[in-house]
């Protein structure tokens, strides 16, 4: 069993999960469909969060009791959470610039590699966190350890397997410059990022949250990963990476300001901290990403293409449906 969800509080656990899942899908749609929605969600909200967090940091530095006991300081004070939320927001604004074709940068050929760069950075943030946990096992001899936020993590080969899976996952991204705006300007599209990558990424990232965010994984691993994937598979073909960035930023901001929801509310759902489950999930992540990179290499060889400079999933249903949505813009000659 991965989570403590079965028992007298089962309905409450699932209700909390459903609230997060549905909320992320709805807010993602607001952010992608309107400029005003994007401005509020990815402009006003981050500014308010930053002011709030800076105020807490100042209070902590002065030894203020209200700041020292604030849930954001108690539960969200590690480097990881701040790195993740601002990296996600950087991705969002880059994607928005591309989909609205803002100025020279929005149409520039070189900037179309931005999605690859920011996703790789986000993945490496998680990989470093996994290896940080592995350090506690291999160097400090700790099979479990408690973070600065009071979360107990399992440490061991599960971190190594998943860290390697994350590194492989970076190279499973193909067609780095094949990124476009949709004709209706609701989405930034990455057609060559098909189900092959999405599934490999989701398994890896779920394992990361299970390893390193055991008190949050029910929400940030299960609900947060499923929301953008459902959208991409059903109604937003080619837009998965934008869905992922938007929902990740939304969740990270919410969790940073309202950690009470996942830490102390009636909806709290913890992982079982079962070493066997953690190892099994990490092996699944590694196998999935090895399988993905092998399949990508096979298609690249079959089509005679460089998988990073060219599309390797040309001819597949996913790519063709996504490509049909792209705007008629001559990116090759954009300054």
Locations of the language-model features?
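Hydrophobic alpha-helical transmembrane segments and adjacent interfacial helices
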Residues: 44-65, 93-101, 116-134, 195-211, ...
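C-terminal transmembrane-bundle signature of multipass membrane proteins
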Residues: 21-25, 220-333
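Membrane-interfacial helical/loop segments at transmembrane boundaries in membrane proteins
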Residues: 1-2, 61-79, 132-154, 265-273
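C-terminal ends of transmembrane helices
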Residues: 23-34, 92-106, 174-184, 230-238, ...
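Alpha-helical transmembrane segments of polytopic membrane proteins
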Residues: 8-20, 45, 73-93, 112-126, ...
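Short, structured coil/loop segments at alpha-helix boundaries
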Residues: 31-36, 104-108, 154, 161, ...
């Amino acid at each position: 069993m991965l989570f403590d969800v079965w028992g007298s509080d089962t309905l409450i656990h699932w209700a909390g999960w459903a609230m997060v899942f549905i909320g992320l899908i709805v807010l993602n749609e607001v952010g992608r469909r309107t400029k005003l929605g994007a401005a509020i969600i990815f402009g006003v909200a981050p500014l308010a969060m930053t002011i709030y967090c800076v105020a807490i940091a100042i209070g902590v530095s002065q030894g203020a009791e209200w700041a020292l006991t604030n849930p954001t300081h108690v539960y969200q004070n590690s480097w990881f959470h701040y790195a993740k939320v601002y990296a996600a927001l950087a991705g969002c604004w880059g994607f928005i610039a591309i989909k609205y074709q803002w100025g020279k940068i929005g149409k520039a050929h070189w900037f179309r590699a931005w999605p690859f760069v920011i996703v790789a950075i986000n993945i490496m943030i998680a990989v470093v966190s996994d290896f940080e946990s592995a350090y506690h096992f291999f160097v400090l001899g700790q099979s479990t350890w408690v973070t600065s936020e009071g979360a107990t993590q399992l440490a061991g080969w599960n971190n190594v397997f998943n860290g390697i899976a994350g590194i492989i996952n970076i190279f499973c991204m193909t067609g780095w410059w094949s990124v476009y705006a949709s004709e209706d300007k609701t989405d930034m599209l990455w057609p060559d990022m098909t189900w092959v990558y999405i599934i490999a990424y989701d398994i890896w990232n779920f394992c990361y949250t299970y390893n390193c965010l055991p008190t949050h994984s029910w929400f940030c691993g299960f609900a947060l990963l499923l929301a953008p994937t459902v959208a991409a598979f059903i109604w937003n073909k080619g837009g998965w990476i934008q869905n992922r960035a938007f929902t990740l930023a939304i969740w990270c901001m919410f969790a940073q300001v309202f950690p009470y929801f996942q830490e102390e509310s009636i909806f709290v759902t913890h992982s079982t901290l079962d070493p066997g489950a953690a190892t099994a999930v990490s092996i699944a992540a590694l196998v999935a990403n090895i399988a993905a990179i092998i399949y990508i290499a096979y298609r690249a060889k079959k089509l005679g293409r460089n998988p990073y400079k060219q599309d390797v999933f040309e001819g597949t249903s996913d790519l063709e449906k996504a490509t049909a949505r792209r705007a008629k813009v001559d990116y090759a000659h954009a300054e």
